[in-house]
A protein has these predicted regions:
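N-terminal acidic, proline/glycine-rich, low-complexity intrinsically disordered segments
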Residues: 1-12
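Long, intrinsically disordered low-complexity tandem-repeat regions enriched in serine/threonine/proline
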Residues: 10-17, 21-26, 535, 539-546
């Protein structure tokens, strides 16, 4: 029975993790089944974890659409709890914001109390009591530097930028920086008192919910917990709260089970990979993190608050992997990070060109490692909100795209590194268990290349130029707008320029813009293993090392 607000809670009998079995074998002879309550209904939160699960021959189960959120409409926490209780699955991955509030946006916008949000988590205790492994994610509330209120409280237009400045000043003042207290008073004076009060009260409530999530890990209700945040900066209330939560995780002795790191949309995907590793057994996946520019691992990427090397290690930890030293034993895979270069932002300020030298060096390193028998994963963090065309061209020229263990280059460095880590862990765990699905793996690789390089760094710019989108605002595109046909044609052309992946093509009828905006795209790939021999590879030299057409002005800020 599902407990919720106003209903008696299920007695807590979850076994503390220290004495609980680490693995739970999937059903004999069948495909593992993982129940997912996602952050929201976008493909990044639903289709991506499903594709990662498919690499390991696993099925991802989602709640009915009516129970999930739809943009600003909250989902139904009671229905989600009932679905979890009734679903026959080997494990569960749960967004605590969705189960508690009805979705990620709802956690920022709807009125709720700490008591009501945490009461909606009671079904997790029942799952844990019957031995079902539960893995959860909780997110620290963001404070984007934008006047766009599409995903925020209505007062974000026009007060978002001032709230962002207030957030940074409050953090610096708390750290004792000279002049920060005066800056905080000035920033506070620019925001109406009722807006400031609501902003801070919501943060207080959500921080208390984040702390309650740590208690779920401490008492064994959840096997692992990811604490994430998107759109952060070195100074801001989200960064301060992440630091406090990280300290509490340490004080509670939860290091290794609680991962505190930048990133949001990829968090459930990371936990799907960790779940698969637990179901299959075999111990942690060892990954060596490299960069052709080692100093680049010390740079902090845009929209983040820690160096990209730290993000890589923490994302691996979230997936159940371990970052190993270069002088250590041979790893299961080598993660090559294309480090932040400050060249631009594919969503708001796309670079006219990128430096081909580091891209060529990374691709050459990937080829050498592959030829030496190593698994190679590539995380393109050079520019946010899209992939570096020079890197894709260099990887294609080396003939290694289809040989990679994983690849991503989308949105933030945290999103990218979490996706790459998840795909890598799922692939390694599946190979160990004899469950690796080569066709699903190829589909995921190609999907990321086409979305991150083909769309974000190319087709999106042309679509926005045609629409005349305002770069400071989320645009809105009707589902039947002619620009969708142009996007489909662009994606098909990008597919034609990529070597390998024989038999796979973009289905033009499947191309959609989630949330009816150009920030992201979704599409299906047709063909598969049976058609591999029927399609000749396109020459590697066909991939151009260029971005969007001249004059294109991608018009979205980072999520």
């Amino acid at each position: 029975m599902t407990a919720g607000p106003g209903r008696p809670a299920t007695p807590h009998t979850a076994t503390p993790h220290a004495t609980a079995p680490h693995t739970a074998a999937p059903r004999p002879g069948g495909r593992p089944r993982i129940a997912l309550v996602p952050l929201d209904e976008r493909p990044a939160c639903t289709a991506l974890p499903r594709m990662v699960a498919a690499v390991a021959g696993a099925d991802l189960l989602l709640p009915p659409a009516a129970a999930l959120p739809a943009l600003r409409r909250p989902g139904d926490p009671a229905a989600l709890g009932s679905w979890l209780a009734a679903t026959d699955a080997d494990a569960a991955v749960v967004s605590l914001e969705t189960l508690g509030h009805g979705g990620l946006i709802a956690s920022r916008t709807r009125p709720a109390t700490v008591a009501s949000a945490t009461a909606a988590w009671e079904p997790l205790r029942a799952l844990a009591a019957r031995g079902t492994p539960v893995h959860a994610v909780t997110l620290v509330t963001r404070t984007p530097d934008s006047a766009d209120a599409m995903e925020e409280p209505a007062y974000w237009d026009p007060h978002g930028p001032d709230l962002h400045r207030l957030s940074a000043a409050l953090h610096r003042a708390a750290d004792g920086e000279a002049g920060a207290a005066a800056e905080a008073r000035d920033a506070a004076g620019r925001v109406p008192p009722e807006v400031r009060a609501d902003f801070l009260t919501r943060r207080l409530r959500n921080h208390a919910v984040n702390l309650a999530a740590l208690e779920l890990a401490a008492d064994g209700t959840v096997r692992s917990l990811v604490v994430g945040a998107d759109d952060t900066a070195p100074h801001g209330l989200a960064t301060a709260e992440l630091h406090w939560l990280d300290r509490w995780a340490d004080w509670l002795g939860l290091r290794g089970r609680v991962a505190v790191r930048p990133g949001a949309d990829e968090a459930c995907t990371a936990l799907v990979a960790r779940t698969l590793l637990g179901l299959f057994g075999g111990g942690p996946v060892a990954v060596r993190v490299e960069a052709v520019d080692p100093a680049g691992l010390l740079r902090t990427a845009p929209y983040e608050n820690v160096p990209v090397g730290t993000t890589a290690a923490r994302q691996l930890e979230a997936c159940g992997a371990t970052a190993v030293a270069p002088e250590g034993p041979a790893p299961d895979a080598v993660l090559l990070v294309h480090t932040p270069d400050g060249a631009g932002d594919w969503a708001v300020a796309p670079p006219a060109a990128t430096d081909p030298a580091p891209a060529a060096a990374l691709a050459a390193r990937a080829a050498r490692l592959l030829d030496g028998g190593h698994g190679v994963a590539v995380a393109d963090c050079a520019q946010p909100n899209g992939a570096d065309p020079a890197l894709v061209a260099a990887l294609a020229a080396e003939g290694v795209l289809e040989r990679l263990t994983s690849y991503a280059g989308w949105n933030t460095a945290g999103n990218t590194l979490g996706t790459v880590a998840a795909h890598t862990v799922a692939a390694v765990a599946a190979r160990r268990a004899g469950r690796f699905d080569a066709d699903a793996h190829r589909r995921l690789l190609l999907h990321r290349l086409l979305e991150d390089w083909g769309y974000m760094a190319s087709a999106r710019g042309r679509a926005r130029a045609a629409l005349g989108s305002d770069p400071a605002r989320h645009d809105r595109v009707p589902a039947d707008h002619p620009v969708l046909a142009a996007v489909a044609a662009d994606l098909a052309a990008c597919r034609d320029r990529l070597p390998g992946f024989g038999g796979l093509a973009v289905d033009p009828r499947s191309v959609v813009l989630p949330w009816n905006r150009t920030f992201e795209v979704d599409f299906a790939l047709t063909g598969g293993a049976a058609a591999v021999q029927a399609t000749a590879a396109v020459p590697a030299t066909a991939v151009p090392a260029t971005g969007p057409a001249a004059g294109a002005r991608p018009a979205e800020e980072q999520e």
